[in-house]
Amino acid sequence: MEFIDLKTQYLRHQAEIEARMQAVLKHGHFIMGPEIAELEGQLAAYVGAPHAITVASGTDSLEIALRALGVGPGDEVVTVPFTWISTAEVIGLVGAKPVFVDIAAADFNIDVDRIEAAITPRTKVLLPVSLFGQMPDYGRINALAKKHGLAVIEDAAQSFGATQNGKRSCGVTAISSTS
């Protein structure tokens, strides 16, 4: 298997990369500077979202999203066990309980047919994970969430750029997370 040649990519864009890095070094705004505002604008436009907020990691973005929704002790979050540990970890960090729904054999994403059975009066959020560049059926997931008065957070760490029904990953739910 041939790997991506990062050095060749760098050399192709070396002048632009170094000029942008020098600009950051000169103005000294290593975080929250104009380059970040530019990146956030480009990310939002790319996925068709009204806003994009960059943070340190995908893990941080999931935790921030849960906290912004007021998820805490006694709440449940429906997600999948077949994902990186951060997805379940942040649910526990905010004091909530992860409720696992198995994956569908066809695409390794959450089995949408099993979500409704996992919803209880304590459920606050559906947190499906898009894996291997594939997205679960967000039309059905969003409809279930609406029916039950739940929020949806898309964990799109592995699907940035994927599309479904003309919408890009990170633009199919009110809150999405990528890394």
Predicted features and spans:
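Solvent-exposed, non-membrane alpha-helical residues enriched in polar/charged side chains
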Residues: 18-22, 40-44, 63, 67, ...
